[in-house]
Amino acid sequence: MDSIVNVVEDDVKYAQRVTSFSSPQNANVKVFTIPRHSFTAFRLSYVSPTELSACSQVTLLGGIPKQWYADQNNQVWKLLTKISLRKVRKQSDMLRRYGYGTIYKKRVGKIPTALYLRKHFTWSYEDNTSIHNGHRLKEAEMEMKRTRSSPVQKSEYKLSLPRRCRSSSDQNFMRQELLKEKKSELSRNNSLPLIDTAQAVDIHPVLHEEDQENTNKRNKSLLSNLKRKDLGESKSISRKDYSHFDRIPSPSSARSVGETDFNYNREPSEDTLRYPDSIIEVTNRTSPAPNSILSRSGQFVNSNDLSDGFSTSNTINNVGLNANEKIFFNALQSMEKENLMLWKTSQKYGTYLDERRKSADAFQKRERGSCVDIGKLHSSHLPFINILPPWPTELTEEERIIHDRLASKHSHHIRKHVHNARNKTSCKIKDSVGTFLGMTNSLTNKATVKKRTGQILKKEKMLVMVKEAIQNKVPLPNFSENECFDTRVSERWKEYIVIARSTGRFDPPILLQFYRHRHIPEIEDISSIATKYHRNPLDFFLSRNCIVKFYSSLDKTISIQKPDKRLGGFIDESIEKKDELKHYSPIKIFILRCSSIRSSGRWYKFLLESLDRQLFTPAINLKIPLTEISIKINLNEIIFQKLIDLGKQEKDRLKICFLQRGYKIFQHPILRYFTVAILEKLKLAHYDYLIRKWDTENPVLGCALKRYDRLEWIPCDEDSLVTGIFAFCQSHLIQYRPIANRLRETKSLEGKCLKEPTPIEGFLIRLTDKYGSARTNFGKYSISTAYFFTCENLLFSMKAYRANPPLPIDSMIDDTSTEIEKEEIWKQWKKIPEVYEQQPYPLDTNDHIEWMNCQTTQSEYDSRDFYAFHCFHRRIDQILKTDNVIDLTEVKDIYQGTRTDYEADKIKYGVYKEASEIFWHRNYEIDDVSRSVINIETSNGLLLKLLATSATVAEEWVIKLKQMISYWKNKQREDTERLLKIRRSNAGLLMLNGEEETKIGENTLRWIVEHGRADEQTFNANGISLSRPLIQKGPLYQKPHKHSVFSKYYVVLISGFIVLFHCFHRSTTGFAKEVLEYAHYVTIPIDDCYLYSGTTTELDLLQRDRTFDEINYGSHALPRVYGDGWRSVEDESSRCFTLWFGTRRALSSNRLQKKGNEKQYTQDYGRQDNNIDPPSAPEADLNNSNVPSNTDKIHFTKKLGVSGKSMVFMARSRQERDLWVMSIYYELERLRRTASTSNSRNQTM
């Protein structure tokens, strides 16, 4: 197993191991890194570049109308719409915060503006991805391509030793730069190339202003000597030999040095320390001037990703020098390597190295002399290291001042370390003495040991329901939502802050408390907890005779069976027959609904470990679906900890291997360990075809949890992997398989292969109302401007003013854009063709993203990455703002107007002509207007008429929409057939009839659950990969409260919201009327809700259809048949899920008084911690970015310990219910992680 760990740690070995078939045996491996917290890195962790490019492409038809541009600049109209659309704007801002905080882990104030993207956009890397000789271009070839394809000219470059390598006394003198002057323009976009991990790249620091002046003087004198040497003695050396100098990075080649506030006291990056002796031919790369990473705006750049030094070894080997010059530069290299090591040591212990100072002083004396010709230098003149006696060197006055400043700067950290060491020592003494005196038990779990009595071990806000058994008094190990004994509800769903406190005893180890208020002390006296007046009657001690299980494997609800406290020790089921039990009370069942699946896994693991029931197992069984075999992988604690530590080192950068075709993503070390171990096992089992298939197709591999016919994909981060593997291994089967995204092709009834069309968007003039009438009730023509766009099988429409069309990266505007900028950008909009394709991820012939390769600079990557995020967010934001939607599978026909149509009603088409001229600011003929009409006929016989900008655009709309209708009708039929096929296959394989198949639940035998087949396309990974704007869609039945009636809605799930559309339009008398489209009903934010499903939803349902069934006792299901052939006989509870929202109340936030009260409460009851209730993602960002100055401002908070509001949704079948629940849980998981990240950041600020 250690050899596998070595392969995982070595990037080159791992890349060669997983690409053994597709790559040549001795091929050079090129590995580079990108920021992990970026939109591109997040999506590449789940999808291939081909799928990513196809999902991101959008086509704009018709261009940008002049009237829309005028409306955007109309301040009066903007003010009126701002007031009327304040709710929509608020939801749009929430969506913006959701997406940015989830992907980039930053606050809202850091979101880049359109001006930033236009400013930092440089050029596209066109024809710049062909790589030779170990993935690098030849110098001459690369230079020609740079000159031909880039408008950026080369700038001045310098060579400098790292600032951190020098002592404080000679920082102004210990610099040797080599400068070659070139007459070229200064580029503001040259930046650092993406960091190479297989061969590390070191980055030089930016010099101070006074250091820069001294450096320039020395550069001129040194350059004059070099020129004289070159002209006088080295005429034989051609100019080509010195062509490498222009690629040596310079700290001042991009901008002035005063613009950057750089931290020189920071340690070097991991790549620099890991590869201090690496030599990289940076001459084959783009000029790495650090203007983007160290820029003032800094929206994307994380300074922790930088290395403070620039290695001279990166360029010296490529410079044509004579023998004496090479001796000089070799000395510089050796000094730099020693300085790097000595600087690391000095930073650790806070001392100055006198050996380094003496050698530096010796070198300074030679430098301060008259300009010595480099060619005349001899090895005897170079600096050497002196061996000094072991007493301290006397410091000069300047050195003493610097030393005192550094000492005062780090004194706080020193005192902190001393305090922590003292606390650790005192804790060890207390534990040793307590164990010796018998005050503690050595068998106490790790979760509760070394904790004071009454100290908080774990805390979270969650939903709680309490049930009580009617007769049973002994907990059962197989208790689940399919309850095996009769129970009644004693406490309905209520939200509490659940606190787990240490008792300091072996049994019970912890105390669970349910708080109704937020003033919670960190340490509380629990000796007299039963007599306290503010005690919640739900509080109980978690004794070792309690049983902790998952109540539901779908929503991961936890159940705790608590027997009577008078029953001590472990209870056997046979005790139930004894007469003594009749004096005890029945058991209580506490059902805990955490905010996310990851949180449920953590609490489940914590509760079991508190009861000394460990979940960690050294042997993990992974099922390989394509082989129908299971592989046991040994993962002991030592190896597991190594992988966790390696994952922490890679938490900020994502490694990517540049293959001949596509990329190979370096996932979390745990997944890499699984990959190498499984490949070894498959080789031994002679499954070479599977290894070759994975190698040639290059899929993204991951883990999934399977239970019967349901697949639950585990996100590829550390917390989700650990929770999913160890917490859910008892209830689910762990599979290792390629991450499946939704296929982009289908087959027609004739067997023809159909490809998914590209989504289209554009401005159109609507000529009919929702009833298909061309005139209103008052006789006027129904004419309105609208913006239509497609997303999968849905055609959305909104008012034209709300639209946000796809624009190039250098033509973007937002609310911060000025009038002058808008006028300049409008000139660019005029040049946009009638058919414009927006593609943030263009691919070359080798499936490589054109702008993401080894030559991509950091600023270029940042601007391109956020542009891709903006494109994806723009599409979701438009769905949030939409007014109506048309299901294209319900469209009967689409056709274009003809020239003869206007003859029937010339007046009407004359009005259409005037409307087109006003909106598009063009001149039209009547026959052109008639050919620009798009007719959409729905299945209910109504006709929708749309007017395009020209006949050509109308024809393009008709062709694209017909392709979409044909594709999505066949795709919908194929999805339904796939569900039916899987259900019939499982019923036949397990010999189950229809009634038995619908009763598959928590108490089903494990062999039945494991042998069930699941379809990866039905339960695809779209929910965790964000490959498409629509996470889930389809018809659902919904009711707002218990005693209302279910109504049918078309529901769309997007990032952070659930959008409901009316399926019917009813008259005043209640009759349904035929309409063209589904109208928007309500938008529900899901960031602050709880989701539960299964039998727990029975509390929200009415008891109906309770007729006695003589054939199936206890069954109250009603058989149903749908138009697409699907049949269902499940109960209502198995088809329903509920969204629970807490009740809010208004509170006065006089924070000064509140803080004073909390301070007094802390003095009385111990240290106060009010961060138990972490705000949601939008609330946290809003509270941080817009802190009000008025302390008496009213704010809203949720009540605790009270019933909330619930919205019940019902699907057609259990399979569809599972799809919706898993999709919502994926999104809730992402939102909860964003909220916790924002809350932890607020605590540190």
Swiss-Prot record:
BP GO annotations: ascospore-type prospore membrane formation; protein localization to prospore membrane
Disruption phenotype: Abnormal prospore membrane formation. Abolishes localization of VPS13 to the prospore membrane. Accumulation of vesicles within the prospore membrane lumen and reduction of phosphatidylinositol in the membrane. Abnormal spore wall formation; the first three layers are synthesized but abnormally deposited and the dityrosine layer is missing. Sporulation specific septins are mislocalized.
Chain spans, region Disordered: 207-270, 1154-1192
GO molecular function, one term: protein-membrane adaptor activity
SMART domains linked to this entry: PH, Spo7_2_N
InterPro entries the UniProt entry points to: Mug56/Spo71, Mug56/Spo71_PH, PH_domain, Spo7_2_N
Superkingdom of this protein's organism: Eukaryota
First-listed, main subcellular location of the protein, grouped into a coarse class: membrane
Motif PxP mapped to chain: 385-399
Bias type Basic and acidic residues, positions: 227-247
Bilayer disposition of the protein: Peripheral membrane protein
Subcellular location: Prospore membrane
Purpose of the protein: Recruits the lipid transfer protein VPS13 to the prospore membrane during sporulation, thereby aiding prospore membrane formation.
Family note: Belongs to the SPO71 family.
Quaternary context: Interacts (via PxP motif) with VPS13 (via SHR-BD domain); during prospore membrane formation.
PANTHER family noted in UniProt: PROSPORE MEMBRANE ADAPTER PROTEIN SPO71, SPORULATION-SPECIFIC PROTEIN 71
Protein name: Prospore membrane adapter protein SPO71
Organism in which the protein naturally occurs: Saccharomyces cerevisiae (strain ATCC 204508 / S288c) (Baker's yeast)
